[in-house]
Structures are given as C-alpha cells and as structure tokens.
Amino acid sequence: MHPQDASTEQTPVDDDQVESSQPVHAPEDVAHPRRIRSFVRRAGRTSSGQQRAIDEVGPRLIVPYAPHPLDWEAAFGRKAPAILEIGFGMGETTAHIAQLRPQDNFLGCEVHEPGVGALLKLADEREIGNIRIIQHDAVEVVAHMLTEDCLDGVHIYFPDPWHKKRHNKRRLVQPPLVKLLASRLKPGGYIHCATDWEEYAHQMVEVLAGEPALENASSAADGFSERPEYRPITKFERRGVRLGHGVWDVVFRKRG
C-alpha cells in the first residue's frame, strides 16, 4: 500500500502521511540511549499554492515553536478539548477530522513544508477554524510546549514502518515517546495509532500496553480496535483493502 514517490527519500504510506526532516535530542525527562526522531528526512517542492497559503494563512494558523508552555486559549481563541496530531503529511485527514469535530481544537506537528502549506490551503478553502500548526519536531513540542494533563487525544496515523528489522529502532512508537505522551494526556484521554504494517501494529499494541498509565480501549484478543468513524479511509488505504491488505487501528486511554 506504499505508493512510489521518486522525488522523496522515503515513501509516504498514504496521501496524508509525510514524515519530515531534522534530528532532535531526547528530552531531559525521558531516558533513552539514542536520538529520538518523530520524522524521517524528506525532499519535495512547495507548490505556488502551498507557498501562498504559508504566506497568507500561516500568520493566522501557524504557532511558532518556543520552549515554553503553549497558551491553548490564546492560540485558538477559545477553550476546547485539545487533540495533538504527530505528522499530518498533506493534511487531508486532519482537515476531515477537524471539520467532523468542530468542538475540538487540533494541533498538528509537521516539519515538511509542502504538507504545512497543503493543510493551510485546505483550512482556508474549507473555512476550518479549529486547526493550528507547529512546524517543528513533535518530540520537542511535546516535551517543552505541552504541559502535563493538557491533551484530550493524540493521533499518530501511518508512521513510517521501517520494515527492515535492523531499522525497527527508528520507529516512532517507542516506550520513551509513549511515556512522554501519556504524561501529557488528561485522565481518560486517548492515543490513536493506525498502520498498514501488521508487525508494526502488534508492536504498537505491545508498546502502549507496556505503559502503566494506559489501558487498551479494545477488549479484542489481538488488542486492535475498530476504525473510529472520525478517521476517514484514504484513497491508498481503500486501494490496499481492495488488494487484500489490512489496516490496523490501536486505541489506548489514560487510566483515571
């Protein structure tokens, strides 16, 4: 289900997932022996329409990265449940969910500039007011801009599977990041992951189940959840299903 994209070093899993550019160090409060990345290096040109959206819409919807707590009410102009999305790619899924759930605030972290421009363009065209973007690595954003118990949900959709065994350690869903995310969730808040790589799906269940603060929202023996209605089926996912490929959703909630 991985479409080829000759202009990039890594191939997105679907039309919404494009992970992006520069390494950061693990936050001080997370023990980890190596650098944590929430993205992979990508290339790609920003179209004129995307650049126009960055220039004209960006000042309204882009929140500058700063290593101090985010003022959610100031950023969104209201108090509302807060959802973080890590790596929104070209933004179609993010825009769809934000329109479907206008009562929630959606903060997307993405460093890939064409993706940022694409989501800004969608938000402007569809008059979506409950999206904000931080164009910075998500690990640093979570560690330094998000306080404990501030999130109602986290979305991680189709992260790079790093399917070769020797590359598995590069996967995004790892215990240090999950521990950090759990600390930022409110009691009852959720982490929702989706992948089309079965082995990674099982690893997601294992890693999330290994975090004491979380519990599986599913009672299924395999630990997987049904796809929530708010997550749309992308065109590549639909094509993969026709070819007999699977997609797995994993949802865990914070205890308490």
From Swiss-Prot:
It catalyses: guanosine(46) in tRNA + S-adenosyl-L-methionine = N(7)-methylguanosine(46) in tRNA + S-adenosyl-L-homocysteine. S-adenosyl-L-methionine binds at residues 85, 110, 137, 160. Pathway: tRNA modification; N(7)-methylguanine-tRNA biosynthesis. The active site is at 160. GO terms for molecular function: tRNA (guanine(46)-N7)-methyltransferase activity. Keywords: Methyltransferase, S-adenosyl-L-methionine, Transferase, tRNA processing. The keyword S-adenosyl-L-methionine applies. Residues 1-35 are annotated as: Disordered. Its EC number is 2.1.1.33. It is an enzyme of class 2 (transferase). Gene3D superfamilies: Vaccinia Virus protein VP39. Substrate binds at residues 164, 196, 234-237. The keyword Cell inner membrane does not apply. Signal peptide: none annotated. It comes from the Bacteria. Residues 166-171 are annotated as: Interaction with RNA. GO terms for cellular component: tRNA methyltransferase complex. Residues 1-11 have a biased composition (Polar residues). Belongs to the class I-like SAM-binding methyltransferase superfamily. TrmB family. Catalyzes the formation of N(7)-methylguanine at position 46 (m7G46) in tRNA. PANTHER family: 3-DEOXY-D-MANNO-OCTULOSONIC-ACID TRANSFERASE/TRNA GUANINE-N 7 - -METHYLTRANSFERASE, PENTACOTRIPEPTIDE-REPEAT REGION OF PRORP DOMAIN-CONTAINING PROTEIN. NCBIfam families: tRNA (guanosine(46)-N7)-methyltransferase TrmB (TIGR00091). This is tRNA (guanine-N(7)-)-methyltransferase.
